[in-house]
Amino acid sequence: MIDWSEEDMRVSRTELKKAHERLQQLSIPLASLSKKQLKALPASDYFMAELMALADITSANARNRQTKRVGKLMIEENRHELIKALFDAYFPKEQVSKIESWHERLNINDEGTLKQFVKQYQASEQHSMYQLLLWIEYAKHTQDDELMAESKADLASYIREVAILTNLKK
């Protein structure tokens, strides 16, 4: 049982920085989607223009700047929908269901499954996973439905993000 009086439920600056870096890394495969897939993305016109500009840049320094810019803009968009759209475009359907099954299997009290996930997806970190699962447990503890929905969406997006990033590194 978790003693909630001893838990600091603030998100650390390090975790926020890691989340921003993941979004920046994901902007590259997002920009390399086909025109048809890009049109289907649930995003604002401004974001789409910046994303398409990233696809056209060839200079390494300019590309790095634009990648950071698109990563920052992803925060202002509905990032969960963008990640889901990229995930669905990136993986075949069989693999999608296999990866998404982790969402139900992961549990804060099951360290073995947590370690197995981190071993399979090298882009993930055990501490980050633990923090996401801790938020779900905290939402259960406080019986906050809105926090629960947000925490589950964050976990699902994290699983998708690290699956894509791990696959990019192969």
Give the positions of each predicted feature.
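Basic, alpha-helical nucleic-acid-binding regions used in initiation and control of genome expression
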Residues: 1-72, 79-170
